[in-house]
């Protein structure tokens, strides 16, 4: 049997615990929202920067290499202008799902802006990385995204860079992948360009 004072104390403790659990769950939910792209459900740019820095630190300690790919939908502005932003959003969601299906466990996908995505392939270089990116390109090129009465087809360009001995940080690898993306676009789009 509890005294009235003990019962009040237990009730207060139970209320305090319930509030703390609720607060903890809300903090966890906020952390997920802060790291996720709302439209596609992938990680966002902030999370990409954090993940690429951690991957670079891991490389510095273990020498386990990695590859970064920057993917951009070709002529996405025209797709948005012609069919509307809702159609563009639909394309982004469908494409993201296809890419997730292709990537290996442990690979990292983030939407870093508009129609641009970043992919980190840990412990993956050269021909193996090229196979992953070729599969992404060919899968997307073969996609038919149905939107209202329209069938939308599109392609992507990808710039790729492997971590190298001269890279001081993850930003260096990212910049080389971004330049490679620009080269892929300049060379006619719907292609992959590996940075030197």
Model-derived segments and spans:
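Active-site-proximal alpha-helical element of nucleotidyl cyclase-like catalytic domains
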Residues: 87-108, 116, 135, 140
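Catalytic-core segments of nucleotide cyclases and related cyclic-nucleotide turnover enzymes
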Residues: 130, 134, 148, 163-195
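A short pre-motif secondary-structure segment
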Residues: 108-111, 152
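Amphipathic alpha-helical "output/dimerization" segments
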Residues: 2-22
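Hydrophobic scaffolding residues in well-structured cytosolic catalytic/regulatory domains
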Residues: 30, 48-55, 117-118
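Short beta-strand->loop micro-motif that forms the acidic, two-metal-ion catalytic signature
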Residues: 77, 92, 98-100, 110, ...
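Conserved nucleotide-binding and Mg2+-coordinating catalytic segments in signaling enzymes
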Residues: 31-50, 71-85, 93
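Active-site-proximal structural segments of metal-dependent nucleotidyl cyclase/transferase enzymes
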Residues: 51-83, 99, 110
């Amino acid at each position: 049997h509890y005294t009235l004072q003990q019962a009040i104390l237990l009730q207060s403790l139970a209320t305090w615990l319930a509030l703390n659990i609720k607060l903890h769950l809300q903090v966890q939910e906020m952390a997920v929202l802060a790291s996720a792209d709302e439209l596609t459900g992938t990680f966002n740019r902030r999370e990409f920067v954090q993940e690429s820095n951690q991957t670079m630190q891991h490389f510095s300690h273990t020498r386990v290499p990695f590859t970064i790919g920057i993917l951009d939908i070709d002529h996405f502005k025209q797709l948005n202008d012609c069919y509307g932003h809702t159609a563009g959003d639909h394309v982004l969601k469908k494409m993201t799902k296809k890419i997730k299906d292709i990537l290996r466990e442990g690979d990292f996908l983030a939407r870093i802006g508009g129609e641009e995505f970043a992919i980190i392939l840990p412990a993956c270089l050269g021909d193996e990385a090229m196979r992953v990116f070729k599969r992404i390109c060919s899968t997307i090129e073969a996609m038919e995204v149905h939107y209202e009465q329209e069938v939308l087809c599109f392609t992507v360009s990808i710039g790729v860079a492997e971590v190298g001995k001269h890279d001081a940080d993850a930003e260096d690898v990212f910049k080389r992948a971004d330049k490679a993306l620009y080269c892929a676009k300049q060379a006619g789009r719907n292609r992959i360009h590996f940075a030197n």
